[in-house]
Structures are given as structure tokens and as C-alpha cells.
Design a protein with these regions (language model features):
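Ubiquitin-like/PB1-type beta-grasp interaction modules and other compact soluble beta-rich domains
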Residues: 1-78
Length: 80
């Protein structure tokens, strides 16, 4: 399975990436498992509150990610 990860705001600064591809042997992976993998790769992300969206839909940690899904890591946004 191959998925696309997109990082925004301070998360892009930490990873020094806007986007990357991840490949897994599994057919699916939970958002929770992906979050753990990302936080072990980019440890400073653990210090930031962020939301995860799967295919442009806000997601909880139990959602299953499938091949070709696009996962966005979104820091808090302010605006008005």
C-alpha cells in the first residue's frame, strides 16, 4: 500500500517537507498506527497539537487508511 502524506504550517517546518509518499506491506493501517510511525520519525511533532484528515475528511484515530489515500497533518489554524 502506498499513501501520500501532506504536512502544513509548523508541521511542514518540522518535517522539512510539504509532501511525501509512504509504502507499507499491510493492506490497511489505522490512523493511530500511522500517527505513531510519524511521531517516531519526527519526534518534535509530538510537541504540537494537530488534526489528521484522510482524503479531505477529518478523521479519528480508528479510521483505516487504504492504498492511495491522502493523509493531511493539520496544525491549529487561526483566522477571522
Amino acid at each position: 500500500m502506498t499513501i501520500t502524506l501532506k504536512y502544513f504550517g509548523s508541521l511542514a517546518d518540522i518535517t522539512q517537507l510539504r509532501e511525501e509518499q509512504f509504502t507499507f506491506d499491510e493492506e490497511t493501517i489505522s490512523v493511530s498506527a500511522l500517527k505513531s510511525k510519524i511521531e517516531s520519525s519526527y519526534q518534535n511533532i509530538q510537541n504540537i497539537n494537530y488534526t489528521i484528515a484522510v482524503n479531505q475528511m477529518m478523521s479519528d484515530l480508528h479510521v483505516k487508511i487504504k492504498d492511495q489515500d491522502v493523509i493531511a497533518f493539520l496544525p491549529p489554524f487561526a483566522g477571522g
